[in-house]
Design a protein with these regions (language model features):
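Soluble, non-membrane globular domain cores that form compact, hydrophobic packing
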Residues: 1-232
Length: 232
């Protein structure tokens, strides 16, 4: 059961391995630390209210690592060495167990269900971005980006200023295995095909898309309001 609910400023997310600049980019204004008793054991959860369900999902993708695994029987939830993460509505939720508390994996799963149930509502699930194609996609490498701050962290060698976030662009990034090689795929979604054409044209001329530059080559194409780039 819930024992403590403590509102905190966004800067406090640093205490929980978060980054205030990233949180703010996804629309987080406050966070709430909650403490629970699971029988005689203790667990904690941090609730961050983002701008909308897709922004909350973006936070989950930004912070997840390839070491994380889906939680059995719970949708849009992952578990890893440092605890679990989950998205419910506009909330990005981190849950963990203090080192001194001997809580099992089943206890942590029970906490996630207590906090957010076994899945998002149909309406919230429908508002999440569609996943990238799964064939060859490295598990949990996909990121959903809504601004320059996150984009610079995920794509440090790319001209992120050309992506068009100021014009409501949304980006998905994923790592793929192609034979023995690893490639980064960037999908840029724009509000209109016209905007996508202008943005893709600018990147095409500035970045030399589809020109053979050896290891620095970038390949791409545009379909409707979506531009797809293969970065390496």
């Amino acid at each position: 059961h819930l024992t403590i609910s403590e509102p905190m400023g966004v800067d406090a997310v640093r205490q929980f391995c978060g980054d205030p600049a990233i949180e703010r980019e996804y629309g987080v204004k406050t966070i709430v630390l909650r403490k629970y008793h699971l029988g005689s054991k203790q667990a904690e959860a941090l609730l961050e209210e983002a701008a909308d369900p897709s922004a909350a999902y973006g936070l989950l993708t930004f912070y997840r690592t390839e070491a994380m695994q889906p939680v059995k029987g719970i949708e849009v939830a992952l578990t890893g060495p440092s605890g679990a993460t989950m998205v419910r509505g506009r909330f990005y939720i981190r849950a963990w167990v203090p080192p001194a508390s001997q809580v099992s994996e089943n206890d942590l799963r029970a906490l996630l269900i207590y906090v957010g149930g076994t899945g998002p509502s149909p309406e919230d699930a429908a508002s999440l971005p569609p996943p990238l194609p799964s064939s060859g996609l490295i598990a949990h490498s996909e990121k959903y980006l809504l601004g320059l701050e996150a984009a610079r962290r995920i794509l440090p060698n790319f001209r992120t200023d050309l992506m068009g976030f100021s014009q409501s662009a949304e980006a998905q990034v994923g790592s793929y295995l192609v034979g023995e090689n690893r490639a980064t795929v960037l999908a840029l979604h724009y509000p209109t095909p016209q905007m996508a054409r202008v943005r893709y044209g600018a990147m095409e001329s500035m970045l030399g898309i589809n020109q053979d530059k050896g290891r620095d080559s970038i390949y791409g194409r545009r379909t409707g309001s979506v531009a797809i780039l293969i970065l390496d």
